[in-house]
């Protein structure tokens, strides 16, 4: 309409403040803010092994790793499950975050060495150095206990889809636990 805002979609600022990334034909490309020039392809699904069709991405704080989401399936308005992959920009390796089933709300630790995520209403942490996966909660159960993600009402009314956060030093995780066991 007449008063609809125009936006630039898919642009991600890099931490140096001089560059940004955007997706172009299955590639994550770095550009210069100053010139708009395309400077480098950071990730290319066509040359990645295995080749994956990602729908979204996030950098670790130091921008050496990229969390890529694939096979995205909606849950509610803002939430979804996905298969996440980790791309290491230093050595070009690409590996699946977890093989235990679809995950929700994967998030890098502040140092970029671990990723927390929710699966089947339980919170997990994957160590990226050795691939070890640690289950943080074990009482998650559909329509009873939800750890690390909000229930439908909180997601819908308060517009958030992740209910956990890393501490600034990355040593701890705080999360919300929703008990729906008495909801009829």
Q: Where are the model-predicted features located?
A:
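Beta-propeller folds
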Residues: 1-184
